[in-house]
């Protein structure tokens, strides 16, 4: 994750490599009866400020919100492996944290606060017709493969967050980059755990 955090030109590669490495370690741990790598929830607990473009935080918040909505709807229908309300809630919490960071809405104790008129890019409801039509597996444009639907949602979230950072022109020196890289990497790792292909051919152009 250090590559992604301190070399913005390799943010995408470093983020996905981190998730890929954790997946490989998890595979080896399972094979040899060892404990899998500990991965904390994909949230921003304890982060109370962010010196990064608002556009980056907004785009990442939308990615979280979209994934949370999709997972929630699929969880309610009960036909999608890996789609749980707990996973949906984690996405929505991260989305709220990103919006709060963008608005600077933290009080002296570090708790989130709210003020009227603050910007919130989240739509809360999104078009997910393709997901509903393909609740078990779906064609993944990025990898060109058919993958488990919940895994596709997680990887789409990770890729959207990576794109938000890499397309920003003023976030290259931010000390938030390692934190944002870790967030996106956790979503990519979750995607692998849910069946998304981990080989390089599926991840890198």
Task: Report the location of each language-model feature.
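All-alpha RGS (Regulator of G-protein Signaling) helical domain and cognate RGS-like helical scaffolds
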Residues: 1-205
């Amino acid at each position: 994750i250090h590559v992604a955090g301190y070399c913005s030109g390799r943010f995408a590669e470093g983020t996905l490599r981190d998730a890929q490495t954790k997946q490989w370690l998890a595979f080896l741990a399972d094979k040899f009866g060892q404990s899998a790598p500990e991965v904390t929830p994909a949230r921003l607990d304890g982060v109370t400020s962010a010196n990064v473009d608002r556009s980056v935080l907004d785009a990442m918040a939308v990615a979280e919100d979209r994934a949370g909505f999709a997972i929630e709807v699929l969880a309610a229908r009960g036909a999608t492996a890996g789609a749980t309300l707990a996973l949906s809630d984690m996405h929505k919490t991260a989305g709220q944290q990103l919006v709060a960071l963008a608005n600077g809405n933290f009080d002296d104790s570090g708790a989130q606060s709210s003020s009227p008129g603050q910007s919130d890019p989240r739509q809360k409801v999104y078009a997910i017709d393709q997901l509903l039509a393909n609740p078990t597996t779906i064609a993944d444009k990025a990898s060109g493969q058919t993958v488990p639907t919940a895994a596709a949602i997680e990887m789409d979230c990770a890729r959207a967050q990576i794109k938000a950072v890499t397309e920003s022109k003023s976030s290259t020196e931010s000390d938030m980059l390692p934190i944002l890289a870790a967030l996106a990497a956790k979503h990519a790792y979750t995607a692998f755990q849910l069946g998304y292909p981990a080989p390089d051919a599926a991840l890198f152009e």
